[in-house]
Amino acid sequence: MKLHGCLCAAMLNDCCMKKGIFRKLIVFIICLLCISGCGADDNTTAVLLDNPNLSESIYSLGDNMGDYKLTDVNGNTYTFSELLATKKAIVLNFWFINCGPCQMEFPYLQAAADKYSNDIAVLAINPTDDRENQIKNYAINNDLSLPFIKGEQEWISAFSLQGFPTTIVIDRYGKIAFSHVGAVTEEGIFEDMFKHFVSDDYKHSIVKNINEF
């Protein structure tokens, strides 16, 4: 599809050069179509385009994380300060139901969460949807036992989320030590990441990116 789109754009562009005043307009439209078509091959990130608060970010990498209380779709509550009293890290995974890349990485995230359940708390936050039954069914249909948090829209602006899935790690010192936009599509990456944050050698906050795991 991408090859056909680019060839079509080239042919129309050549034709438009002979069309006088319509050339610029048509070329502009074709360029937009090409950009859209060629970008469709990147299937690891589903980008949210209609959020008006993307620029109102509160938190960034290296910041101290505030204390928040969240409630999952089953009525269980999770407070960051209480979690960090018994865990070595909190992982926030932002997703939404129709996000293909989110579904792609969930098995890897679930496996890592199960392996490091004693040391790491993983919360799956859906900031765009508060439909409890749909979220519960999604978890059941995808064999997921992670705590699913519904409809926390303020997180979009709090972290200036620009795509889904987004994974953020709050380390044992309460600092944001990791942030990644896009699906983790290789087995073992989440486990390597979790191993880093639970290690006894983790003596102070260290900000890392996905390529370091």
Where are these regions (language model features)?
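Thiol-/selenol-based redox modules, centered on thioredoxin-like
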Residues: 169-213
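N-terminal targeting signals for export/organelle localization
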Residues: 2-69, 189, 210-213
